[in-house]
A protein has these predicted regions:
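Cytochrome P450
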Residues: 1-153
Length: 153
């Protein structure tokens, strides 16, 4: 989220200007934009057809979050970070159903509170260099992100 807000300072100004009003959509956009899970694999429990492709019970299918969260049929301007995006049917937390992430509400709350405190204490915080990324087949993450800010008085 910090990297996105640093790369799109206009979006940060929108959110910081009406933190409470924009927080619900901003949090969802951070989840869509920076989902830490790369993919999830499942086994089909029955035969299905999806977009003209037949798949049999027992076949393995993979949901690629980065692809689903940039789907042009699902999102208007999917390659734009938009803190007011609504609706935002992202695939974060598994997209719903039996495998929905039990920690989803906690994660949303952590994002909201963390950015609320950053906005309050160091509102001009911004990335100062590219992040060092975590290289993993399953997790899309940032190891370190250098940031800078003006010292509060």
């Amino acid at each position: 989220g910090m990297l996105a807000l640093s790369r799109y300072p206009g979006e940060r100004r929108i959110w910081w200007g009406d933190y409470v009003g924009v927080a619900p959509t901003a949090v969802e956009e951070i989840i869509r934009w920076a989902s830490p899970v790369v993919y999830m694999r499942r086994t089909l429990t029955r035969d299905v057809e999806l977009s003209g492709v037949s798949m049999a019970q027992g076949d393995k299918v993979t949901l690629w979050y980065c692809s689903g969260n940039r789907d042009e049929d699902r999102f208007t301007d999917p390659w734009r970070f938009d803190v007011r995006r609504n609706p935002n049917p992202h695939m974060g937390f598994g997209g719903g159903g039996a495998h929905f992430c039990l920690g989803a509400n906690l994660a949303r709350r952590e994002i909201k509170v963390a950015f609320e405190e950053l906005r309050r204490q160091v509102p001009d915080i911004s990335a100062t260099a590219e992040p060092a990324r975590l290289f993993s087949a399953f997790i899309h993450g940032i190891k370190t992100l250098p940031v800078g800010w003006t010292r509060p008085r």
